[in-house]
Amino acid sequence: MGIWQGQSRRKATGGKYKIVVKKHKKEMGRESAETHLTDDTKIKIVRVAGGNKKVKLLRTNYANVMDPKTNTCKKVSISNVVGNDANKHYIRRNIITKGAIIETEMGKAKVTSRPGQSGIVNAILINE
């Protein structure tokens, strides 16, 4: 069964709306690509609206970390997910989303990209 993101057929009171238009393909959704921290890298290319392509990062172990002091970027390996405000269970499952705090070779970094949408993990080094 697909994920549908259109208007609900029921009102808040439980009554039904009168159906005026049918369901459209543009209202379809997909399951989120929860980027896991593993030893290998796996991506999935999906066709989206307008014939464009979206690169979903499913598994990874590297991140592009920028050091704001030296203004340089370096590809480093990720060792652990330390914090994630999106969901507290993502820390235990090592799932990387935008805003997650990751432990890298350079130190702790905050993820600035959306790995499930852009296909890459970009992060900025945080000072503690």
UniProtKB/Swiss-Prot annotation:
Keyword check for Ribonucleoprotein: yes
- Tell me which GO cellular component terms the UniProt record holds: ribonucleoprotein complex; ribosome
NCBIfam families from the UniProt entry: eS8
Could you identify this protein by its name?
Small ribosomal subunit protein eS8
- Give the record's subunit note: Part of the 30S ribosomal subunit.
Per its UniProt record, what InterPro entries does this chain match? Ribosomal_eS8 (IPR001047), Ribosomal_protein_eS8_arc (IPR020919), Ribosomal_Se8/biogenesis_NSA2 (IPR022309)
Q: Does the keyword Ribosomal protein apply?
A: yes
